[in-house]
């Protein structure tokens, strides 16, 4: 997975996440929206300016109480924690 910063402002971050699809992006978006200070989290895999399919671009907006890059890090940690919890529950049920 490669990341490329598109825009990095005080309360907004847009970053391209190469090689991912709707499955991962929806989970990441959901984890971001659970964070205090995140006012919006969206992603787009077909921006109008691209003229066609692109790698997904996630956009994070905050209220200023959290840096958008820190929010991305915390959101990714939440995804990892949820994945680990699911794996443990699955193994316990098997």
Swiss-Prot record:
Per the record, what is one GO cellular component?
A: cytoplasm
Alphabetically list the UniProt keywords.
Cytoplasm, DNA-directed RNA polymerase, Nucleotidyltransferase, Transcription, Transferase
EC no. given is 2.7.7.6
Subcellular localization, as worded in the UniProt entry: Cytoplasm
User: Which Gene Ontology molecular-function terms are recorded?
Assistant: DNA binding; DNA-directed RNA polymerase activity; protein dimerization activity
Query: Tell me, which GO biological process terms does this entry list?
Result: DNA-templated transcription
Going by the entry's taxonomy, the superkingdom of the source organism is recorded as Archaea
UniProt keyword Ligase present: no
Reaction(s) catalysed (UniProt annotation): RNA(n) + a ribonucleoside 5'-triphosphate = RNA(n+1) + diphosphate
Q: Can you tell me which residues the record assigns to a coiled coil?
A: none
- Establish whether keyword Phosphoprotein is in the entry: no
Stated family: Belongs to the archaeal Rpo11/eukaryotic RPB11/RPC19 RNA polymerase subunit family.
Its assembly, as annotated, is:
Part of the RNA polymerase complex.
**Could you tell me what this protein does?**
DNA-dependent RNA polymerase (RNAP) catalyzes the transcription of DNA into RNA using the four ribonucleoside triphosphates as substrates.
Q: What is this protein called?
A: DNA-directed RNA polymerase subunit Rpo11
């Amino acid at each position: 997975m490669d990341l490329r910063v598109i825009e990095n402002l005080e309360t907004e971050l847009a970053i391209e996440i190469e090689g991912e699809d709707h499955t991962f992006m929806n989970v990441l978006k959901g984890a971001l929206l659970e964070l205090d200070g995140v006012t919006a989290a969206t992603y787009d895999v077909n921006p109008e300016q691209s003229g066609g399919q692109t790698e997904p671009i996630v956009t994070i907006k905050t209220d200023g109480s959290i840096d958008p890059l820190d929010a991305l890090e915390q959101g990714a940690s939440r995804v990892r924690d949820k994945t680990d919890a699911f794996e443990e529950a699955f193994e316990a049920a098997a």
